[in-house]
Structure formats: C-alpha cells, structure tokens
Amino acid sequence: MRGLLAIAAAVIVVFAPVSAFAAKVSKSEIAQSLSSQGYAVQDVGPNTLFVRVADYDIRIDIQGPDGDISYRAWLFEVDGKDVSYKILNQFNNNVKFGRVYIDEDGDVTLQMDRNGAGGSSIANIESDFDVFLMLISSFMDHLESQIIA
C-alpha cells in the first residue's frame, strides 16, 4: 500500500510542473496578440516586452515557471514630489488589483500583476491589458480630483 502511495505521489510531482508549464502563455503569443490590436510592441529581453500606448510605455514581464504576468507603467508626467502618500494610499485602498507607488528614482509607477498559477489564456492577457489601461486613466483622474479638491 505504501509503495502505491509513493508511486502515485511521484507521478503527481513529476507531471504537475508539466501541466502548469503547458498553461503558460508565451511572450511571443502576447506580443502577437497586442500587435494584432494595433499596439506598438517591442521585444526588449528574454521575458520582457514594452508596449507603447499614447504617451505611456508599458512594461510587461513574464516571470516564473507559471508565467506570472506583471504590467508596469511609469507616469513621467507626474512628479513624485508632488504626490503625497495619502493620495497614493487612497487609490491603492480603492483598487485591489493594482497599486501605485513612487519608485527608488522618484518616479510614480503603476503596477498590476496576474498570478499564472492555474493557467492563463490570451483572452485573459488581452482583458488584463485593457484593465491596466483603464487603471492608468483611473489613477490620473484620481490624481486630478485630489489636486483640484
């Protein structure tokens, strides 16, 4: 009985990473999908794409064995010195799927992540990218409302 359990456990361990890897969306699939939507996509490294949308360069990183996706945009038109932590925290508390912060260079940075565990599809990536674009707009609206108020 113990022998059968050991064999079953070994089979699960051996094949589990394969199924997770199979669910990973490749960088080239992401690039092709976003390019087909009219976005300017640039391959800048083994796991990184930059996508130009209006005035923003959005960095997409594909990380880890499950293909976790990280979207980041640096909002260079916003001076980090002019944005209080109160404004950042208000936005971060209201938006649970993204976050805005001031990076080590003083740049205002917006980030959103997708955990690849369980798999993701091109449709998920396209949807996430649209959500990230809305998140940028939402933060800029939030910032404007705080400055005007």
Label each residue range with its predicted role.
Residues 6-16:
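Bacterial N-terminal signal peptides
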Residues 118-149:
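C-terminal partner/receptor-binding element of secreted or periplasmic proteins
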Residues 16-22:
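Sec/Tat signal peptide C-region and signal peptidase I cleavage site
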